[in-house]
Amino acid sequence: MTDTATGVHSNANGVEKVPTPVFSIEGEPTQETAPTRMDPFDRPKNDNDPFEDALKRCHKILEKLDCPFVTGKEKDLDESDDMTENEDHDEMANEDDGIPSNEKKVETRKMDCTSGQLLAPKLPEKAESISSASESSEDSESVAILKYTVRTCYAIWKKRQKNSEIALKGLMIVLELCLSQPSARDDAFSALLETLGYNTVTFWKAVVPQIYNSDLSYATQYREALLFSLVLYDVNHSKNRLRELYAAVPGVRQSMLGIRAKQFGERYRHLQMKIARSRASSRMSSKMGSEENLPAMASMMNDVVFDEEPHTQSPLVDMSHDKQRVINVSNAPPVSISRKTSGSWEIKQGSGGLVACVDPVMSADKKNIWLSNLGVNMQEELKEHSTSTNSLGLPLIKQACAGEVFCVLERNEKKEELTPKQQAVESDMSLLSVLNTYNKHSYQLNPVVVNQDDYNTYYGGISNGLLWPALHNLPQYISPCFDDPELLREQWCAYVRVNYLFAINAARNSRAQDFIWIHDYHLMLCGQIMRSLESSLDIGFFIHIPFQPPANFMTKYKTVADPIMRALLRFTKVGFQTSRDRDTFVKLVAKHIKRTKIEYDSRLDRYTIEHDGWTCSLGVFPVSIKIADFVNIAKNPQTIIEAEEIKKQIMGRSADGGQLFFSVERFDYTKGISEKLRAWQRYFEKYPDRIGKDVLFQVAVTNRRSVDSYRQYQDDVLAVADLINQKFKSEDYPEWKPVIFETDGLPRTRLIAHYLAMDIGVVTPSKDGMNLVAKEMLVCNPTASLVLSTGAGTEVQLSNAQFYSEQEGKCYHRVEEISNTEAFADNFFAAATESKETRTKHGEKINQFLCVHDIDEWSDQFLDPKWTHEVISQCEVKQLGQFYGLMSRTAQVRRQIVECVLKGLPIRPHFRYSLENAKNSLESSCKSGTKLSLEADEESGEEKGFEITYDIHDELSEMEKDLAFLAFIQSDEYENAEEFIKTLGSFYEGGPVLFKNEVKQAAEMLQQGIHYNTFFTDRDGTLKSYACSYPTSVQPAYSAVIQAQFARRCATFCAIVTTAPLLHTGILEVATIPEGYYAYGASAGREWYLNPAQQFKDRSFSAIDLNLMNKVFDIIEELLERPEFRIFKWIGSGIQKHCGHITIAKQDVNGTIPSRKVIRLYEQLVKIVNDFDPNGTTLTMRESDLDFKIYVKAKLKGRIFNKGHGIRLVRERLKPNMSKGNCLVCGDNESDIPMLEECLKLAGSKVYTIWVTADTNLQEKVTQLCDRFSCSNIHFVSCPQVLLGAMAYATAHTLVDERNRKLDYYYDSDTPMDQEESSTLGASLGTSFGN
């Protein structure tokens, strides 16, 4: 047999075995003895136990290394081989893939080789080594050999010296054993990973090719076993070691998730849409009217489809994605599958709480996908795999077992006697055919097929043997077999394995825009596993049962409990049925999971927990029912007639005044049926006058009879029911029975008829997630009374809604503790004697509440992203820290928007909600118009009572533009760019017409340059209007996209040169363009940033000068702490320390600071500069409209470093060729003139320049400067949005020109295009904001 999760082969007895080895480790194979293909793992040729073989081979390796394992003698590793030395660890693992560099290192250990016990110093606690407590004494030495082999071989291999290849073979022997028995040897695999430490990436690079070779030659399927082993390790240790494998072999992740295929499918679909749109024009319809062109057009996009970094490799990308789907994942399917006597498969709509809850959501869109196990799994069969190579040793195309899973869905037996027509009928009867038919008329139902043994262990073991009773706080029903740690570990491996299969199926079926919804306790690990496969997935989890584990759950069952708690924190959001369940989870996290940050938002009733770099939102969502379905049946005349007949049939044998108590549930020990019957018995003992009157009609649908605990419980309950009927009889009504007990389920119509017939509904579970029966009862029959236990989630919901309070009245009969038989019996009596008027009054109140809070509300609220941490919540902004924090979060959201647009990814609704909430928060916090008054907080360091007022007109306006941009960017309209430019005109003070004319004139000049070899521009005032404060001058998403697209389509080297610093309230914190489009020249070009690996600074000033500037900065900071000058910290750029100068804001954009205050600040600054530099040799001070700047003079000539010097610096370091090609320069004030002058010196008349200014003096200076260099390409615009509109317009028309040129070439030329031309055309066939 083959484990579908790991690919491990087993014999008929279930013992795992490795394929027959072909290459001995004794020495290199000779020509006479060498096999056709060499075994990369050097396995000996025998059928012995693989564990024993591995031990023998370990001994041989150790002998070759002259480090034999000696029994009874301690063996110390040489100190020079200490595993804490990781100086040669792989840099890619340590940096590029984010592997923590501060991870605890493995210390050298001594080992008692007689007992196999580990002596001090020990491994770190995180390293889960093989526990001697769980091993038999005869295995202890064998385990010690494996560990010793790993440590010895690693110490030699990592030095890359003599015998390193032999040492690597030793490590591979241990690895092979782990992969051949992944469930039995997970502890050895953990020890191997911990020993390798930072060298795992290097190790995988060396070993994975051998694993692939083994799979190809011997059908070992070790690749799948390796993936599962890493998943199991990550789950058990809360790590992500899978990323190390991705770093070593990037193709592994892509093949696992089918990334290439999904990308191609998306792009191909979009290309078809574009072709369809293009056919609307007469020219395209005549030349593209034939479908024969479609494959040719698809081939044009091949290169574009597979770009790993679209924002640096491909032009504008398409945003016409499919809308978000829901990928629903559950253990149980929404259908019931059976095979008729004729042999054909039949699919019927399933029943149960999960189906009732989720089916309305799934049915809303046929593209939604439901993944579940259909009960058709891999059977335990011994299969001899056919050879995977031919007679020449070459690999066969189709490996053994390649179609094994699909055979499960088809009829396995071949009926050769059937005619072709009969075989076609037989095919139509196959399960696969039935599923396909089902999917045509509903959402997509995809089966998850697993090994049947694994499924049985996962379902009957951890899921229902441990988690089900534990989470219901019924420890007495936990299977005693889990007291054995070894058995618990084995069953836990099966649980992980099945979760892994569900997770990888869900990841493969999902797209970036989809929401993946995991359900219930069977699949608690899926979130963590899926996030290790693809970290950007949006995954939610809802637990339908209670979360009330016993007190010892986290200690006695730590093997299971700890990983599950950590795994739940990897979901984006987790939903609970009740606040009681959520509070229990939060308390357990706070107590048992270290390094967590827990926050509660009372307005949203949301907990947010941060752990290990992941954030999870916890909410409460009481499940409900589809009201209309029940009400329609209840109001049906036929149902009403049937209810009357039921009432007459049952109560016709009772005395007048009798009450019909009705209860329906699964025959489960969590439902409190046993306690209910004992209370019913006590009821008649306490109140004998009710004998002969009241009847309890109990429906308990039998299930899980194969589980011992269930079978015993059900038999005991039935015995109690018989005892009650024998004990209580009425002489006046001899046919009366106190209990009517049914074990068969009722059809929905019949069930609702019983709801109408009952007088009192009884729902008294010991623990239940919600229990929808109670809601069904009062929705159908609002005149009925309800006996409800506190164990039901419905009771918690009704209690929280004040339906059981002194103020609102007690609208139901609450059973506090079902084990309290006396009180339970009293509740029965109170319900039986309650007046009909009171009963109706209370029932109708609950009925109205339930009709409002139906199933649609439940699913809508859970699926709504607004309540999660990913969306900025609406709040009142009162303090400076809140304002800056809110704007910082909008910067994060805008970066995500820009990245999605540039990469062609779908725009998630989270982004719009976040910007809307941020905008509404600011607007509602303004006291008058756009004036926002803020007070000091602890983060600002200010005293209480200090208040500052900002005019946030720019911040609000930019958010409004971004919201409009989001609406246009998701449009499929061809001219969405042009339409958005028109929308920008609505924000223009001069009106849309004037804006359009300005944009057109500026765009015409931009188009004259056709393509710019270099592009240098200022930011604030040029590309971005001035904000009230630099920390709030976040670059809008629309602006970032326009600039990025212009840089990609219209220029070669682009740089933003600004006087702001890089960090510490600098350009990198407020910019939202991804790396790769622009270089940033901060501090007037004195410090440059392209990416983390490319940064450089000006070194023209000495350390003494820099120290002097730092002292001046400290004194100015102290000055601005004084109350009369404090205002200058919070306006404009505040106080900033740059590379080579200091900036101090003197005025805001609205000119609200009185001139007398500005003069006093100026005088103080002059005094400080003169005190430190009385001769003026080092420092100099300059003044602009909004700032004071104190510069360190250039080293040689005492000049101020300006943007012209910054251009020189970048030319020296990056060497852009400015003498060839056109150069574009944009600015808005005099500090930008040196930048223009430097470019004119280099490019002369090839310079094109646009200035954002209405200042005639500045315009004259720019014009005169250009005249000096015979440059006439000058244009002035009134505001940044005009410049951005011109850039967008020029970009769009550049695309149109290129598209037309390519299409003319394609259709008018008989010469086929080469690959580069083909991919360029395919990439150019798109909308202006889309590819």
From Swiss-Prot:
Keyword Protease in annotation: no
Enzyme kind, highest EC tier: transferase
Swiss-Prot/TrEMBL keywords: Glycosyltransferase, Transferase
InterPro entries: Glyco_trans_20, HAD-like_sf, HAD_sf, T6PP_C, T6PP_helical
One Pfam assignment: Glyco_transf_20
Glycosyltransferase recorded as keyword: yes
GO MF terms held by the record: alpha,alpha-trehalose-phosphate synthase (UDP-forming) activity; trehalose-phosphatase activity
Region Disordered, annotated ranges: 1-50, 71-118, 1312-1331
Gene Ontology BP term (one): trehalose biosynthetic process
Biased composition (Basic and acidic residues): 39-50, 102-112
Xref: SUPFAM superfamilies: HAD-like (SSF56784), UDP-Glycosyltransferase/glycogen phosphorylase (SSF53756)
Deleted gene: phenotype: No visible phenotype.
Bias-annotated ranges (Polar residues): 1-13, 1318-1331
Catalytic reaction equation(s): D-glucose 6-phosphate + UDP-alpha-D-glucose = alpha,alpha-trehalose 6-phosphate + UDP + H(+)
Stretches with biased composition (Acidic residues): 77-98
Role this protein plays: Catalyzes the production of trehalose from glucose-6-phosphate and UDP-alpha-D-glucose in a 2 step process.
Family note: In the N-terminal section; belongs to the glycosyltransferase 20 family. In the C-terminal section; belongs to the gob-1 trehalose phosphatase family.
Protein name: Alpha,alpha-trehalose-phosphate synthase [UDP-forming] 1
Organism: Caenorhabditis elegans
Phylogenetic placement of the source organism: Eukaryota, Metazoa, Ecdysozoa, Nematoda, Chromadorea
Gene name as annotated: tps-1
